[in-house]
């Protein structure tokens, strides 16, 4: 391709928007990422993710959730769901417009680079599969695709 020309990327289904959303949490203790794929980014999907974390992944013990100020994090339904686990959960609200303070935001950047950047996929399912593969590699201690977080704070 000559300099100044724009590459044309074919679209399989022009004019149709397809979305999948990832909810994720980084566990400082075991250096792993817990995640769930959702069709919608809303209070109900986030509550399902909280239940996955607190019931399936960490049924006992206490956890700290660092959360930003996205609207569904502070919805009445989410706050009510969190109140059911108030004896085990400490919510740490991050200041507005400070994604650099949230470790999972660093991981999302890493994930996008490995799973999506400069890659043409044939379907949304292929994009999700690519993302899930990179996510699974984060939880494999021997994988070279892992993003390591410094714990020398």
Question: Where are the regions that the model predicts?
Answer:
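Short, aromatic/basic amphipathic alpha-helical patches
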Residues: 75-85
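Acidic/histidine-rich, metal-coordinating catalytic segments
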Residues: 61-74, 102
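C-terminal anion-handling pockets and recognition modules
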Residues: 90, 104-153
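Mobile genetic element proteins and their domesticated derivatives, centered on retroelements
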Residues: 24-25, 31, 50, 68, ...
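Short, basic/hydrophobic alpha-helical segments
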Residues: 45-64
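Structural signal for conserved beta-strand scaffold positions within catalytic alpha/beta enzyme cores
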Residues: 35-37, 93, 115
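Extended, low-complexity cationic-aromatic segments
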Residues: 1-51, 147, 152
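RNase H-like polynucleotidyl transferase catalytic core
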Residues: 6-15, 83-103, 119
């Amino acid at each position: 391709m000559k300099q100044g020309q724009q590459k044309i990327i074919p679209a399989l289904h022009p004019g149709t928007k397809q979305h999948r959303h990832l909810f994720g949490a980084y566990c400082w203790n075991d250096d792993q990422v817990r995640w769930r794929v959702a069709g919608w980014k809303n209070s109900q999907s986030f509550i399902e993710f909280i239940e996955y974390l607190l019931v399936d992944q960490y049924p006992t013990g206490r956890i700290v959730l660092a959360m930003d100020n996205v609207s569904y994090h502070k919805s009445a339904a989410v706050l009510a769901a969190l109140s059911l686990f108030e004896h085990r959960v400490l919510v740490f609200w991050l200041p507005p417009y400070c994604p650099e303070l949230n470790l999972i935001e660093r991981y999302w950047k890493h994930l996008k680079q490995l799973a999506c950047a400069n890659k043409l996929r044939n379907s949304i399912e292929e994009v999700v599969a690519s993302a899930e593969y990179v996510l699974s590699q984060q939880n494999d201690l021997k994988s070279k695709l892992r993003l390591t977080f410094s714990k020398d704070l």
